[in-house]
Amino acid sequence: VLFRSADEYVEAINQKQAKAHNVIIRSFTMDDDIGTMSYATAQADIKSRPVDRNLVDLFAATDNDVRRRCNYDSKRIVNKIITTKFRSEELCLIIAEAHAHLNQETDALGYLNQLRSKRITQDYIAYTIDNLPEVFQQNIKTDATGIPLTKLMSAILCERRKELFVEGDRWFELKRNGRPEFWVAAKGKKFITEKYLYTFPIPKADIRLFPDLLIQNPGYIE
């Protein structure tokens, strides 16, 4: 079974350690003092600010999507626990995206709809090429190949964002899809993410050791 019911999804997604239902790999399997403290700190941190309005807008047309109440509450505070697992649902979305890149639209829609049918609990309508929503206005504008998003690719990436919220995917999603530039406000300040920030700088000590071999990554002052 590739996907479980909505109720089974809710049960599985709230298991911090258990390999429940469609979990393939777990990276957090046991508690220790440091791990528990780090996990608690991270969980508290994500509750310290409301969920991005852009994510909330993704659910605007699908009030019956079970992930909406799992992800955040009416005040946009995160409900979902931080998840460090690889689930079969992500594998399905990877397959859907691969088919989309190959222009195999029917296959891509098939995998996308398999997942959606298990998350939208009432009034579910399968996507077709004719009824796909318009390209969602978000930070990501191009796909992994640099091509502007099609309706199908936009739908797949939107589904990834809803399904993999606080599962450690978002930064990689941004990096592989055009490294978009955007800003966020925090603690009264404006923080801008520029393209070069998706790559870490090479430590200066390493450059000094191998000056003829290493060149600092673009955007960083040597």
What is each model feature region?
Residues 43-45:
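Active-site PLP attachment segment
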Residues 1-34, 53-222:
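Acidic/polar-rich alpha-helix caps and helix-coil junctions
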Residues 38-41:
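Acidic, serine/threonine- and glycine-rich low-complexity intrinsically disordered segments
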Residues 47-53:
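Glycine-rich nucleotide cofactor-binding entry segment
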